Amino acid sequence: MVQRGYMQYLYEADGRKYLDTVNNVAHVGHEHPRIVRAGQDQMAVLNTNTRYLHKNIVAFAEKLLATLPGPLSVAYVVNSGSEANELALRMAKAYTRQKDMVVVEVGYHGNTNACVDISSYKFDRKGGTGAPGHVHVVPIPDTYRGIYREKEESGKRYAFHVKEAIEKVRSQGKGVAAFICESILSCGGQIVLPEGYLKEAYQHIRNAGGVCIADEVQTGCGRAGDYFWAFESQGVVPDI
């Protein structure tokens, strides 16, 4: 039985140590001293939430926004990735006054009802009931096991399916609210998107009046090597 964790390790009660390779999207390990200290310091001053204005909320938002391209200039502090994606969906629907979503096969965006509805990783697996009527799934842009495996032009070819999904929505007399995609497909197999995929997909969505959402829950905040945000590797700027 695991008793505690420290940095990249887990420890049993008898002191046996394990390298933790299964803890999902841990960023800086367990009980990182700087994180523990920052949490202790804040708890000793104010247990903050969004109902109260506190200088540290503003300072955090400013530091976060400094890592993003200029057009992305507003930050909301929420409790989880699921809540962040729920908020993104609400904003996209409010802005476009549409409901239909274009999503990627085997994508995962959270465990709330609305997030499961747009997560092929959930609704197409055991216990799932398939995509809801307002959700349109495009093929996973995987150049290793996917339908297009050549390096050149595969990004455009996969993105063309986004255009096809838009045309399907329009044929039903509706419009598209948004396209949501993990900047690196995480639960789908840690798949790096082919070059040009997001640029082409985003253009199709914007031409249709929709909003482009980059899900960076598992890939953002410095996890993508030279890029602080994984969408930067595709040379794009999302709307949300």
Where are these regions (language model features)?
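Conserved N-terminal phosphate-binding loop of PLP-dependent enzymes in the Aspartate aminotransferase
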Residues: 1-240
